[in-house]
């Protein structure tokens, strides 16, 4: 069972997004940052180009691997994808909550059958680049972002997920509705006065931790810094 959030060291709650497009760039970042952070996230850009070897790079560093490929397909296909992700050493995996509880349950069952019931399976709710207007256009509804996030969080729990990926702006409502044991991974983290880039719903590290985030995902504020290791240490300090 995962440690409760208060017991987790701040560095173990910081996930650095390897938002680069080559093994060489990822290798340099992992070498610089692995003494200071507990996790690295590999997304679709890096994985599509470099594949399994970049996962091995993270695992060989001693860090934990968040494979963020956001599976969304028929249950049998998703189950197979999860089995393959686990074979690569994934410690955390994303799936889209909108795939529904049957798809999500297939993922959980695949993990259990592989002897990896400990893997953190998190369902994506509403992507953090969407504001309310765009979200409603996508879903064909008229509702608040928070309401949609909560509905998808309930789908995630029904499907056996460990938790969800959600903005810290909706995080307190998720914790109230789902309980503190329901893990929330929060992307869209920016430092004060930084550009939002392509994110619409962003918060600082302090705001995310105060709101109850179990993990925060940070990309550009670390990997684009002049000194990524110093930037990571600074964010860890802000989380404490």
Regions found by a protein language model. Give the residues of each.
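N-terminal amphipathic alpha-helix/helix-capping segment at the start of soluble metabolic enzymes
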Residues: 1-29, 59, 171-172, 176-179, ...
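Conserved anion-binding
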Residues: 8-12, 73, 77-162, 167-170, ...
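Conserved beta-strand positions in the central sheet of alpha/beta enzyme cores
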Residues: 15, 38-41, 66, 94, ...
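Conserved, mostly hydrophobic/aromatic
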Residues: 16, 40, 70, 93, ...
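Structural motif
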Residues: 35, 61, 88, 159, ...
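A C-terminal functional module that forms or caps the active site or interfaces directly
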Residues: 52, 65, 167-217
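Glycine-rich phosphate-binding active-site loops on the catalytic face of alpha/beta enzymes
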Residues: 88-101, 190-192, 198-231
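C-terminal helical cap(s) of enzyme catalytic domains, especially alpha/beta-barrels
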Residues: 104-110, 114, 209, 222-240
């Amino acid at each position: 069972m995962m440690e409760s959030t208060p017991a987790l060291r701040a560095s173990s709650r910081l996930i650095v997004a390897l938002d680069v497009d080559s093994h060489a760039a990822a290798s340099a970042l992992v070498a610089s940052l692995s003494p200071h952070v507990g996790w690295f996230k590999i997304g679709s850009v890096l994985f599509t180009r470099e594949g399994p070897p970049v996962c091995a790079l993270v695992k060989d560093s001693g860090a934990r691997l968040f494979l963020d490929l956001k599976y969304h397909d028929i249950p049998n296909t998703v189950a197979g994808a999860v089995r393959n992700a686990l074979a690569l050493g994934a410690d955390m995996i994303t799936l889209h909550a909108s795939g529904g509880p049957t798809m999500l349950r297939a993922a959980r069952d695949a993990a259990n059958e592989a002897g990896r019931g400990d893997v953190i399976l998190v369902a994506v709710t509403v992507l953090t680049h969407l504001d309310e207007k765009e979200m409603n256009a996508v879903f064909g509804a008229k509702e608040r972002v928070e309401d949609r996030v909560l509905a998808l969080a309930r789908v995630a729990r029904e499907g056996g997920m460990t938790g969800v990926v959600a903005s810290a702006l909706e995080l307190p409502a998720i914790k109230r509705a789902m309980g503190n044991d329901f893990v929330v991974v929060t992307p869209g983290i920016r430092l004060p006065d930084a550009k939002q880039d392509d994110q619409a719903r962003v918060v600082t590290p302090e705001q995310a931790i105060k709101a109850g985030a179990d993990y925060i995902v940070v990309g550009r504020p670390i990997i684009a810094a002049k000194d990524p290791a110093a930037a990571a240490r600074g964010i860890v300090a802000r989380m404490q």
